[in-house]
Amino acid sequence: MKFSVDLTAATRPEWVKTVMADLPAFMQDHADCERKASAMAMSFVAKYPDRVEIIPELIETGVEELEHFQQVYAHMSKRGIHLAKEMKQDPYIQGLMDLCKTDPINRFLDRLLLASIIECRGAERFRLVCNALDKDPELKDFYHGLWTSEAKHGNIFVKMALRYFPEKQVYERLNELNRAEGKLIERLPFRAALH
């Protein structure tokens, strides 16, 4: 059984150029994404307290994402980059959330699967940023570590879904959402942002 997500569309090189042209803005957005990821994991705990089998993993993920926020903030602070005054709307996340079914059971499945896809996209993009950071070895190492961590998170949300839904249903819906994510990523404009 496979828990990882193979993205259907690779990030284009123009995205990396956009990020490298404004690394401070990227890092501000990255910090916001880590805060949101931590909050998302904890929102699963709050919304689904009866799903006791996954609560420990969700708490662990929430804490890890908050540690990532702390780490990116330390790198920002060292470089004189402040946190953004407000968290901007993320058209990528909004586009994905629009794909969620509305009935509570299927929405739960969709949110888990979208979390996997988002984490896998983050891992792919952290790898690209890492590979582009030739002049800052410290930041390069940081993004290398994040790339491996985010890849792991992509797997755990699929595993969580498989605890509550039949394998066929999970993978069919994962493939649908993954294809839709690929189309979304190809049509969004490039920004100095993670998504």
Regions of interest found by a model, annotated:
Residues M1-H195:
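Non-heme di-metal
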